[in-house]
Amino acid sequence: MNNSFNKNYYSTNEGDLSRRNYLSSALDVYYSFFKNSVKWQQELYASLSIGGSNNEYREFGQLDYAYRSLSSSIALSSINRYYFNELFVGFNPSLNTSYFRRNDESFGTHYKDYTSRFNTYVPVHVGYGRIERVEDARQAAYIYNALVKKARAKEGKSEEDLLMLAEKISQLKNERFFDARNKKIYELEELDKYLKENGFIDEDDITYFATLEDMWEYGNSPSRWSGFRASAFFNPGYYIYENVDRAGNDSYYNHKYYLLKTGVKLDYAKPINMYWQNTLSFTSYYGISRNRTNGRYQLRNDWRTPGIHIGVRDQIGFYPNTRTYLSAYSYVYLAKQMDKPKNEDSSDDYVGSFKGKSLRTGAGFSGYYYFSPQLRLNGSLGVFYSADIVDPDYENVEYYSPDSDGWNYYGGFTNSKNLFDYQFSLSIEYFLF
């Protein structure tokens, strides 16, 4: 929760000349849940955000400027897969809603408007295979190897021994505590007990405990995955955007999008070894969207747009130790929008659609290098290319981004070819103390 308040004024012996008040407050709540068993994989995510602000400025006791705003948003999503041996049925609903309202008074004018958004998707999957999180197994190997290197653990432990240690780590991480310090103390005590009871430890001293604490604190990230999963999906969705402007012409816009996709999705994740990870995904679907935009008194447009989408993304990660990583990625997304003729029986002049082709491709990397406790390097580089071609008869249209899970619309799309873009960032951190 964040709150801020600022008050300042300028005055003379004759009274206040100016006065400004500013107050803002925000509340953010986030919840996540992960479950993995032989029969059931589940992830839950929920977030709530509420905020507001008030800003006033007065001169000689008269209000010159006042701005007040209120915003809120709720996001809910769930990933569920129920397994029958290697086959599964999945249901992954999501819901997002937001509201923003503002009241602006300045120099004799009064401006009010509000914007609300709501979207939901309810995809259903049927597929084969599963992908598991394996960072606990990697952390078990980190702990054991670090203790062997410090001559505090016995060499020769088998892969089965390390898998049993990984299972213990998973159990400890799922224990719930209100106080994070008590949780960490409990985890280290239980881990120390397990290592001694199962013959891992030769000697326990300050070096042993410092190494164990370090690997427990920093050896659990980033997330690592392993497995293959293929699925066919059916994904209906609905999105509504509404804007009301109470100033001037008192405008009103209501945009509704009805979405439907069906296709296939392939995911592959492979930890090549302790240090290398490869992740590959492929998606192809056919979808149709309908966009109806209403003004206060009339229908402004009614677009019906079928389309085909194909996308491939590959990422390779290199993790030489617990504090350094390098990740390289590349992707290609292709989309084709196909014109659907207007219903000849319709008397609605606003019904239409469009033709177009789109290409998005890019490659890049990001990395974090830990030289020492005092010096760290963080950087990223990306190069991107895009090309869009629209039938000349359909230039001023609503268009969707081909690389999104839903259809993201923006207006005024025109032809664009051979557009290159790049992104580069580099930062060096040096700590004096």
Question: Residue ranges of each PLM-predicted region?
Answer:
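Transmembrane beta-strands of outer-membrane beta-barrel pores
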Residues: 3-9, 33, 48-58, 70, ...
